[in-house]
Amino acid sequence: MDPLWQHFMEIIPAIDLLDGACVRLHQGDYDQVTRFSEEPVAQALGWQEQGATRLHLVDLDGAKRGEPTNDGAVRAITKALQVPVQLGGGVRSAERAEELLDCGLDRIILGTVAIETPQLVCALAERHPGRIIVGIDAKNGRVAPR
């Protein structure tokens, strides 16, 4: 019998990528990084083996710099996993969104661009129904776009 919570919510494990490694930032501080693994594909496969039905990736380099540096890891993960993979972090243009959706990602998460260019989000959502998520961060009770 399935646990009751499975009927009401989906728990999605996340991997934060920084310079190709799996990390965790302390309260979003890039100066306080804990490196968990240098092998993102192995980490992702571990979540799948533990029963994950979806995986959430965050490109921290993309989020901070606006430039992707973890595409190799992202592509390798999407290729290796049997479950859907979604990604957020640094997706700030239609071209980048299309590139990510074409590389095998199931969904992409738009943050800053959703606040700065909402018409882009609408256009992408029309072209890719069900594949665009808007993620809004908050800090001290206010929207924190970056």
Task: Enumerate the language-model features and the residues they cover.
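Conserved anion-binding
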Residues: 22-31, 98-101, 105-146
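Hydrophobic faces of well-ordered beta-strands that scaffold small-molecule active sites
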Residues: 10-15, 55-57, 85-89, 108-110, ...
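Glycine-rich, proline-tolerant flexible connector loops at the mouths of alpha/beta enzymes
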Residues: 54-72, 112
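Alpha-helix-loop-beta-strand connector modules within alpha/beta enzyme cores
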Residues: 65-88, 121-137
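Non-catalytic positions within long, well-ordered alpha-helices that form the structural scaffold/packing
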Residues: 48-51, 101-102
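Short, acidic/polar
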Residues: 36-47, 92-98
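N-terminal amphipathic alpha-helix/helix-capping segment at the start of soluble metabolic enzymes
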Residues: 4-27, 139
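Catalytic cores of alpha/beta
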Residues: 81, 85-107
